[in-house]
Amino acid sequence: DCLLSRGLGDVYKRQILLLPISGILLLWKGGTVVSLLNEVFTSQSGCAEVLLCTGVCAIASMNDMATPSVSLEGKSLWLAQSLPVKPWQVLRAKLKVQLALTALPALVPLACMAFILPVTAALPLVFAEVLAYIAFSACLGLTLGVARANLTWTSELMPIKQSLAVTIALFGGWLYAIVFAGLYLWQGWKLGAAAYLAIAAAVTLAVTALLFRWLKTKGAQRFAML
């Protein structure tokens, strides 16, 4: 797979390492951060859980290898298309790479949260929301990658760093994090952290299911015609 041979260079290695590093930083200074957040947002309980969840989602959004994975095939795309497998199976393999190399590193900061956050109903829902976001990010990135594939690049950096699809996926991930945190600080805190996280995870999974269905049907057809 072209993604494995090219995409996982220094750029993606650094992005993957950001998640475990953030977990180590949480163990080191997480207690201080949680105390500070609780002091600043005294009247808005659960902010520590939601904002730390937001931080992990924002970092995970930087690991966008699924987005350029189709474009990185370049003129050798015909090799993937000529394999005795369905187009959807090729796309599914790209999704699995993104999920494995994002969800597994994300378990490090999530596990570290369990040591610094109080054990409440919100804690397991932080895990659920982060993993739901990672699935959403992978499906969104691959959807953009298929819809805006560029197979005529002259430098491997073009589909990785100079692609509109990558830009949309990256800034879309950050926008998601901003809206997620902003809604909680605005009105969501009235629901409580657990209820808010549960609703956010459910909505995220619903949108992910729609993107997944598009990839499996129209996305696979479009990939076969590139």
What would you call each of these model-derived segments?
Residues C2-L8, Y12:
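Single conserved hydrophobic/aromatic residue that forms the stacking wall/gate
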Residues D10-T32, L52-C57:
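Hydrophobic alpha-helical transmembrane segments of multi-pass membrane transport/permease proteins
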Residues P20-L25, P87-W88, R92-A121, L125, ...:
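Hydrophobic alpha-helical transmembrane segments that constitute the membrane-spanning cores
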Residues W28-V50, P109-V130, W153-I160, G188-Y196:
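Membrane-interfacial helix-loop-helix connectors in multipass membrane proteins
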Residues L36-V40, M62-L83:
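Transmembrane helix boundary and interhelical loop/hinge segments in multi-pass membrane proteins
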Residues C47-M65:
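Long, hydrophobic alpha-helical segments
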Residues V126, L131-W174, A224-M225:
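A structural motif at transmembrane helix-loop-helix junctions in multipass membrane proteins
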Residues Y133-S137, G173-A220:
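Alpha-helical transmembrane segments of multi-pass membrane transporters/translocases
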